[in-house]
Amino acid sequence: MEVNCLTLKDLISPRQTRLDFAIEDAENAQKENIFVDRSRMTPKTPMKNEPIDLSKQRIFTPDRNPITPVKPVDRQPQVEPWTPTANLKMLISAASPDIRDREKKKELFRPIENKEDAFVNSLQLDVAGDGAVDEYEKQRPSRKQKSLGLLCQKFLARYPSYPLSTEKTTISLDEVAVSLGVERRRIYDIVNVLESLHLVSRVAKNQYGWHGRHSLPKTLRTLQRLGEEQKYEEQMACLQQKELDLMGYRFGERRKDGSPDPRDPHLLDFSEADYPSSSANSRKDKSLRIMSQKFVMLFLVSKTKIVTLDVAAKILIEESQDTPDHSKFKTKVRRLYDIANVLTSLALIKKVHVTEERGRKPAFKWIGPVDFSSIDEELLDVSASILPELKKEAYGQIRVCAKERLVRYGSFNTVHTSEKIQRKVSSEPSSPQGERQGSAYSLEIGSLAAIYRQKVEDNSQEEAFVSNTAVPPASILDPALSMDSEYCVKPLAQPVFSVAQTDLPAFSAQNGPSGQVGVPVPSAASDTENLKPALLAGQPLVYVPSTQLFMLYGSVQEGLSPESRSEEDGGGSDVPADLSVTPSAQKRLCEERDPQEEEDEPAMKRQSQEFEDSPLSLVMPKKPSSSTDLACPVTMGNGSSPPLEDACVKGQLPAAEEVTGKAAPNCYVASECGNPARNPDTEKPSNENEITKDPSLMQYLYVQSPAGLNGFNMVLPGTQTPHTVAPSPAQLPSFGVPCMFLQSPGLGPFPVLYSPAIPGPISSAPGTHPNPGPMNFGLSTLASASHLLISPAAMVNPKPSTLPCTDPQLRCQPSLNLNPVMPGSHGVIHPESPCYVRHPVSMVKAEQSPAPATPKSIQRRHRETFFKTPGSLGDPVFRRKERNQSRNTSSAQRRLEISSSGPD
């Protein structure tokens, strides 16, 4: 009876729909019912399976209604055997969510299931655990909730847009994926787009650092420039024009003229033949990050700020390779959608539709920042790992910050041991110094050797460059003022390097008769030398870049009161030879450090160095640490030391204060010996770009040292009429100039060289004036008579002399006062080096030195220089006095110290 009741119920229900459905899914239902629920095949089997089973029977006729269930024995011949394939299908059907979703959708669209619970019993044969699956599917997020745009908004909400510079936020992709309830691969898409805009940076595997939007405008400005270099705007215009032409062929008017079919492949070819895409063939270049940067470039270079999706896809995706396989092209278009979703979440673009003749096309409009005029023009360092495809085409524009001041010339050779000395000096313990971080030093030292090697091989061009260099004319010095001198020296903090004497070639230069110079200036000038070609054209200044010798020479005009112009040197430099220069007169000179160094290095560090001067004659040693290379024949004079004068150490006067028209009393004073009515002039820093009023009044030779090779700084005032320099020694010109060598405080044993003496015959008569004889820079005439001043300490600034000089050669030497604060403390400045002479000597080799330097004193000075701390920086005069008392001095120096009490 129960079976009959079920049959009647089945007849009442709309069986036709269920029967159709059963026939449709007969095979799947048969497999599931037979192999899964064989144990349940009882007379209570639902009517859902009866039509399926009976329809498969060949003996089934409409007259035979299934009153009783069919026995399993009757169906055995028609059943497929139990195979692994059938088992796999069953497992897939049970476990795959997609298959279950399809089954659910099919059931929802069945009319019988939209009515009453007519088939409650049919649900009894569902897969075991299906109720739990339904609960799980209720918890699963919808497609909208899983969208990348919404996920990116949730991701960005976790971090501040403008984080503080002090706080460092680290993003763990695993934690974020668990927190947001998504897979980690979804977070990868977001992070790659954010990394392309420098909002995040990779720290480690699955670890990123959050930077925020601080550098976003600069990044967009950089991408805009790169997009302009890639000519993306022209490519978009070309593609749009091709599409317009295609529409013209399709709709009309050109077909009448026998023009080709619009489906012609030539018309549909948007390949990269005419406008090659910047995409490369490597896998990294096709990454989502690179595509994101290019996608942003399209918006930044577009005039309308609207980019359609198909144009972006044709430009950014290599259609020439993917044209046969449209599935790959569509996949990459989906990646553009992913990028657009993230950019939309960042509020940089929004989705719009462009209406054309064919209909609406998806497009995106840029709503982010467009005005980059207020942004600093300095380019971001777009590394090759981020934009490798732009490295070849836009390399010169990306590395604008790389100044080409590391170029050297083959005429100046460098000893390789100087780099070892620099590394040794840098490794010593010393007071903290600000590092040079300007754009002028952006090139690494590792590339220095390659640049040098290349320049050494190109000697012919370099010699031609030096031979074409113009040197302004120098006027004869006034004899009445020839021995007046004022020196304002600021201590430098570069390491000292010395090289062999044989490394100095003849300095070739050509004097210009008009005082105008024409020197090719490199396109990428350093920050420390703000010398424009216009300035060079109007000022008697010669600027020779990237050599190892730094010289500044000048002369005063005949008949006029000498004036001094100060030049700032752009850093230390190597002296390529043991140079002993004979001066014909003294003049007021001031040397300052690089303004970038003045800002970086602490003021107390600059104040800690002093300069002493005493007349000495010395040949520069080949090695700073060698104690036997000081060739100084000691010949004492009449025993009287030069008088003392107030010393004014130049400490921390900023370069901005030293402008024309404003006196700097702490930098120089006028010497009244010989011409008391001489008026002091002010200093002119070269970085102020102030042109002298009288171009013929002062001439300077400025030779810049390459970055990273810091050494001596040489100041040479020229006092000779112009001579043409020829390679032969007989035709070499002569410069009778006092010279000053400023050493680095890092290597204390090496002395400061200062030459106030004169070349030629020196008369012992008090009234005779020096003869401004010639001095050649050639090796054959390099040995000349000179007085040199040696001191590893700092050099002080002389003031007007009030006491007469007993030495005829030093008749007009200004006296020195060691302490301007304490006028009572007078004492003779004795040299740090044991070598002390008063008479001119010629340059000799190291083995001719009768008085070698004491290694003990040299080593002591070396330690004192490095172990100065800012806490111990007091008055430099007191420190020097204590250092002089505690230093091991020679007998000659002690005698000088005793005799110094006379002028007091």
From Swiss-Prot:
Keyword annotations: Activator, Cell cycle, DNA damage, DNA-binding, Nucleus, Phosphoprotein, Repressor, Transcription, Transcription regulation
Gene expressing this chain: E2f7
Amino acid composition bias (Polar residues), ranges on this chain: 886-904
UniProt family annotation: Belongs to the E2F/DP family.
Name of the protein this chain belongs to: Transcription factor E2F7
Subunit details: Interacts with HIF1A. Homodimer and heterodimer: mainly forms homodimers and, to a lesser extent, heterodimers with E2F8. Dimerization is important for DNA-binding. Interacts with MN1.
Organism, scientific name: Mus musculus
One GO CC term on file: nuclear speck
Residue spans binding DNA: 143-212, 283-368
Subcellular location(s) of the protein: Nucleus
Induction, per UniProt: Induced at the onset of hepatocyte polyploidization.
Main localization (coarse): nucleus
Keyword Disulfide bond annotated: no
Region (Disordered): 61-80, 252-283, 560-628, 846-904
Domain notes per entry: In contrast to classical members of the E2F transcription factor, atypical members contain 2 DNA-binding domains and regulate transcription in a DP-independent manner. Both DNA-binding domains are required for DNA-binding and are proposed to form an intramolecular structure that is similar to the winged helix structure of the E2F-DP heterodimer.
SUPFAM superfamilies associated with the record: Winged helix' DNA-binding domain
GO molecular function: DNA-binding transcription factor activity; DNA-binding transcription repressor activity; DNA-binding transcription repressor activity, RNA polymerase II-specific; identical protein binding; RNA polymerase II cis-regulatory region sequence-specific DNA binding; RNA polymerase II transcription regulatory region sequence-specific DNA binding
Expression tissues: Widely expressed with highest levels in skin and thymus and very low levels in brain, muscle and stomach. Expressed in trophoblast giant cells throughout placenta development (at protein level).
Phenotype upon gene inactivation: No visible phenotype; mice develop normally and live to old age. E2f7 and E2f8 double knockout embryos die by 11.5 dpc of massive apoptosis and dilation of blood vessels and show increased expression of E2f1 and Tp53, as well as many stress-related genes.
Biased composition (Basic and acidic residues): 252-269
GO BP terms, alphabetized: chorionic trophoblast cell differentiation; DNA damage response, signal transduction by p53 class mediator; hepatocyte differentiation; negative regulation of cell population proliferation; negative regulation of cytokinesis; negative regulation of G1/S transition of mitotic cell cycle; negative regulation of transcription by RNA polymerase II; placenta development
